[in-house]
């Protein structure tokens, strides 16, 4: 099923879409309206189905978008959202990366790809790949993972990453 809701963060509207069955299968969002959100939903559905997840796009009302919004604005801790995630279609490595990031890097903090890789005895490139494939943005705070010399990449848009970090109170992201 899918549930879509809009919320305000200061001057910006965020539209959050949640794909779910018993638990959250995937999350996507847009600061650029419904049309861009639909593109993001299509990309998420393709990603999930390519990984064997059965997705039902029947619209259903749910409090899950509000949960994600409350995590975004800091009313609920990211790690408290982990229990709502299905982890369907993720590899054991990705699940470990997502859980470690969510539990260890708190709101208002950032970590480099290299630092997270060292923590997990992996490579920065493998961490970057896991971040790019993260089906649970905001709950699993991939926006908090930065390059050693700049903000780093972010799907769908780098300015989304900047906004999410600023919303959390991060002022600088270079060492």
From Swiss-Prot:
Residue ranges of the TM segments: none
Highest taxon listed in the record's lineage: Archaea
EC number: 2.1.1.63
Residue numbers annotated as active site: 142
Matches recorded under InterPro entries: DNA_protcyst_Mta_Thcoc (IPR054936), MethylDNA_cys_MeTrfase_AS (IPR001497), MethylDNA_cys_MeTrfase_DNA-bd (IPR014048), MethylDNA_cys_MeTrfase_DNAb (IPR036217), MGMT_N (IPR015236), MGMT_N_sf (IPR036631), WH-like_DNA-bd_sf (IPR036388)
Keywords (A to Z) from UniProt: Cytoplasm, DNA damage, DNA repair, Methyltransferase, Transferase
Substrates-to-products reaction catalysed: a 6-O-methyl-2'-deoxyguanosine in DNA + L-cysteinyl-[protein] = S-methyl-L-cysteinyl-[protein] + a 2'-deoxyguanosine in DNA; a 4-O-methyl-thymidine in DNA + L-cysteinyl-[protein] = a thymidine in DNA + S-methyl-L-cysteinyl-[protein]
Any GO MF annotation of the entry: methylated-DNA-[protein]-cysteine S-methyltransferase activity
GO BP terms, alphabetized: DNA repair; methylation
Location within or outside the cell: Cytoplasm
Gene Ontology cellular component annotations, sorted alphabetically: cytoplasm
SUPFAM superfamilies attached to this UniProt entry: Methylated DNA-protein cysteine methyltransferase domain (SSF53155), Methylated DNA-protein cysteine methyltransferase, C-terminal domain (SSF46767)
Further comment found in the protein's record: This enzyme catalyzes only one turnover and therefore is not strictly catalytic. According to one definition, an enzyme is a biocatalyst that acts repeatedly and over many reaction cycles.
Family of this protein: Belongs to the MGMT family.
Function: Involved in the cellular defense against the biological effects of O6-methylguanine (O6-MeG) and O4-methylthymine (O4-MeT) in DNA. Repairs the methylated nucleobase in DNA by stoichiometrically transferring the methyl group to a cysteine residue in the enzyme. This is a suicide reaction: the enzyme is irreversibly inactivated.
Name of the protein this chain belongs to: Methylated-DNA--protein-cysteine methyltransferase
Lineage: Archaea, Methanobacteriati, Methanobacteriota, Thermococci, Thermococcales
Gene: ogt
């Amino acid at each position: 099923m899918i549930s879509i809701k809009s919320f305000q963060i200061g001057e910006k509207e965020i539209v959050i879409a949640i794909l779910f069955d018993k638990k959250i299968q995937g999350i996507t969002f847009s600061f650029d309206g419904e049309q861009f959100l639909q593109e993001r939903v299509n990309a998420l559905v393709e990603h999930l189905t390519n990984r064997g997840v059965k997705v039902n796009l029947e619209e259903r009302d749910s409090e899950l978008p509000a949960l994600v919004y409350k995590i975004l604005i800091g009313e609920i801790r990211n790690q408290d959202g982990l229990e709502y995630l299905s982890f369907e279609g993720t590899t054991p490595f990705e699940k470990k990366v997502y859980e470690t990031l969510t539990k260890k890097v708190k709101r208002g903090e950032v970590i480099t790809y290299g630092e997270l890789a060292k923590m997990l005895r992996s490579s920065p490139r493998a961490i970057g790949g896991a971040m790019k494939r993260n089906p649970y943005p905001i709950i699993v705070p991939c926006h908090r993972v930065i390059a050693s010399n700049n903000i780093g990449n972010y799907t769908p848009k780098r300015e989304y990453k900047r906004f999410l970090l600023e919303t959390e109170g991060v002022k600088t992201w270079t060492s």
